[in-house]
UniProtKB/Swiss-Prot annotation:
The keyword Transmembrane helix applies. GO terms for cellular component: endoplasmic reticulum; Golgi apparatus; membrane. It comes from the Eukaryota. It is a multi-pass membrane protein. This is Probable sugar phosphate/phosphate translocator At3g11320. It holds the Pfam family TPT. It comes from Arabidopsis thaliana (Mouse-ear cress). Belongs to the TPT transporter family. TPT (TC 2.A.7.9) subfamily. The chain crosses the membrane at residues 9-29, 42-62, 77-97, 100-120, 130-150, 154-174, 192-212, 229-249, 258-278, 281-301.
Length: 308
């Protein structure tokens, strides 16, 4: 009985850590890029990936949290590099969108990921779902259309970036299912991050130097005036790794259904917390639109489960 209770507390603690790190990194990204005025989303993403590279190595090679899996061929490496590029695009575009959009609206758009996943799965693998599954995507898209039309802080460029980030995130999940589908090439999410993060840094470094000129010099100058920026960047980057770590652990210690429910609720919690902190204006119509999208996502998950 005591072991079961301890296990329950451990799972609750894991879920709380997962929520805190997810919502924390989102809010801190928004604060840095928008409120603090640190307008360098590519450099910020590079900091995240550098932390993920270092901390992944510590967790796997030193702490042995999971067994280390090796890359077995050049083809497998190229597949991981392709995934890493799409992953980079999704994170960078997501961070760019946070400069222009409130977190609440950003999350509403992000909730349309199942729509893009279904589209890419059909276009790339010709995988067709049951008609009922496609029908449940109607409220997902309709909700975002309603939320967009009534969003007081709507910004077209931010909106396009957020849609692109959501589409890239969906594309990565579809490609991952195709590229790493054979038993010999399958990697757990911790090992995949161990290899993807350094490759992402290689992609992001030239992009940062070309598109965000002298960002290192600007950051050093900022640190001289306000050293808090260094702590913000270090904490934010470590938090970005803990999002992945807690996501892996929650997946391992809960069922797929529990994870789905928690994932849907997480977006709603992030919306409420961000509105309370940033006090961005929201409309009743916008919140109804977001609620419709979340309901659509829940129906979509249920329809997919039943069609299996």
């Amino acid at each position: 009985m005591k072991i079961a209770a301890n296990g329950r507390f451990f799972t609750i603690g894991l879920v709380a850590s997962w929520y805190s790190s997810n919502i924390g990194v989102l809010l801190l990204n928004k604060y840095l890029l928008s409120n603090y005025g640190f307008k360098y989303p590519i450099f910020l993403t590079m900091c995240h990936m550098t932390a993920c590279s270092l901390l992944s190595y510590v967790a796997i090679a030193w702490m042995k949290m999971v067994p280390m899996q090796t890359i077995r061929s050049r083809v497998q490496f190229l597949k991981i590099a392709a995934l890493s590029l799409v992953f980079c695009v999704s994170v960078v575009f997501g961070n760019i969108s946070l400069r222009f959009l409130p977190v609440s609206f950003n999350q509403a758009i992000g909730a349309t990921t199942p729509f893009f996943t279904a589209v890419f799965a059909y276009l790339i693998t010709f995988k067709r779902e049951a008609w009922l599954t496609y029908f449940t995507l109607v409220p997902v898209v309709t909700g975002v259309v309603i939320a967009s039309g009534s969003e007081p802080s709507f910004h077209l460029f931010g909106f396009i970036m957020c849609i692109a980030a959501t589409a890239a995130r969906a594309l990565k999940s579809v490609l991952q299912g195709i590229l790493l589908s054979s038993e010999g090439e399958k990697l757990n999410s911790m090992n995949l991050l161990l290899y993807m993060a350094p490759i992402a840094v290689v992609f992001l470094l030239p992009a940062t130097l070309i598109m965000e000129k002298n960002v290192v010099g600007i950051t050093i100058a900022l640190a001289r005036d306000d050293f808090r920026i260094v702590w913000y960047l270090l904490f934010n980057s470590a938090l970005a790794y803990f999002v992945n770590l807690t996501n892996f652990l929650v997946t391992k210690h809960t069922s797929a259904l529990t994870l789905q429910v928690l994932g849907n609720a997480k977006g709603a919690v992030a919306v409420v917390v961000s509105i309370l902190i940033f006090r961005n204006p929201v409309s009743v119509t916008g919140m109804l639109g977001y609620s419709l999208t979340v309901c659509g996502v829940i129906l979509y998950s249920e329809a997919k489960k039943r069609s299996k």
